[in-house]
């Protein structure tokens, strides 16, 4: 399945989450798109709930179905709880760390920064969004990209940086200090539903 590249507000309203991170797309119309959106009261099956949770998380991180499932399978080979390991692997993606540092307003924009070669890891250019960032690695904006307008605009509006990352706005450099705790990850996601979905 290809990555969705259409309007993110449609997916946000359909799934009931804000993919932009601002919540604006849900303020005026907090229901699925379409003329019958506000009156829909369809009962959802257990399978439907599990699938919806999977779709929420997949779209939140902007992955294709194959990328999503591959990451899920990789998490299953690690010690510990499958769902928790899965969420941590998603958080360790380079595009997500770039987003968490405030260098991009959305994960989609962060993925473009990485794809276009604007980001380095430990001084080396990395253009793979799925690259897994390890604790202690240094993420920087390339010197040639320091005046990128998209990065500058994002830094102007971004104020919250999670405690598990640090960022120096002067040098445009940050790092992953530690793995995020459950309370610091997406509270609106129930990863147990996703584990159940793939266990069927």
UniProtKB/Swiss-Prot annotation:
The keyword DNA damage does not apply. One of its GO terms (biological process) is ribosomal small subunit biogenesis. Residues 22-43 are annotated as: Disordered. The keyword Nucleotide-binding does not apply. One of its GO terms (molecular function) is rRNA binding. Keywords: Ribonucleoprotein, Ribosomal protein, RNA-binding, rRNA-binding. SMART domains: Ribosomal_S4, S4. InterPro entries: Ribosomal_uS4 (IPR022801), Ribosomal_uS4_bac-type (IPR005709), Ribosomal_uS4_CS (IPR018079), Ribosomal_uS4_N (IPR001912), S4_RNA-bd (IPR002942), S4_RNA-bd_sf (IPR036986). Residues 92-170 form the S4 RNA-binding domain. GO terms for cellular component: small ribosomal subunit. It holds the Pfam family S4. Gene3D superfamilies: Ribosomal Protein S4 Delta 41, Chain A, domain 1, RNA-binding S4 domain. PROSITE patterns: RIBOSOMAL_S4, S4. Part of the 30S ribosomal subunit. Contacts protein S5. The interaction surface between S4 and S5 is involved in control of translational fidelity. HAMAP family: Ribosomal_uS4_B. One of the primary rRNA binding proteins, it binds directly to 16S rRNA where it nucleates assembly of the body of the 30S subunit. Belongs to the universal ribosomal protein uS4 family. PANTHER family: 30S 40S RIBOSOMAL PROTEIN, SMALL RIBOSOMAL SUBUNIT PROTEIN US4M. This is Small ribosomal subunit protein uS4.
């Amino acid at each position: 399945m290809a990555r969705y590249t259409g309007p993110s507000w449609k997916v946000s309203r359909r799934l009931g989450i804000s993919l932009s991170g601002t919540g604006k797309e849900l303020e005026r119309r907090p229901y699925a798109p379409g003329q019958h959106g506000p009156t829909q009261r369809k009962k959802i099956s257990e399978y439907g709930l599990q699938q919806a949770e999977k779709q929420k998380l997949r779209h939140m991180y902007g992955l294709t179905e194959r990328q999503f499932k591959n990451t899920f399978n990789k998490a299953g080979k690690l010690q510990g709880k499958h769902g928790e390991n899965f969420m941590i692997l998603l958080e360790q993606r380079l595009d997500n760390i770039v987003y968490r540092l405030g260098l991009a307003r959305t994960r989609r924009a962060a993925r473009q920064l990485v794809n276009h070669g604007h980001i380095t890891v430990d001084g080396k250019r990395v253009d793979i969004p799925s690259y897994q960032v390890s604790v202690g690695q240094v993420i920087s904006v390339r010197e040639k990209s320091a005046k990128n307008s998209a990065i500058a605009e994002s830094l102007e509006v971004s104020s919250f940086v999670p405690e598990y990352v640090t960022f120096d706005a002067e040098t445009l450099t940050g790092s992953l200090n530690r793995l995020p705790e459950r309370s610091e990850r997406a509270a609106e996601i129930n990863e147990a539903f996703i584990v159940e979905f793939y266990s069927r």
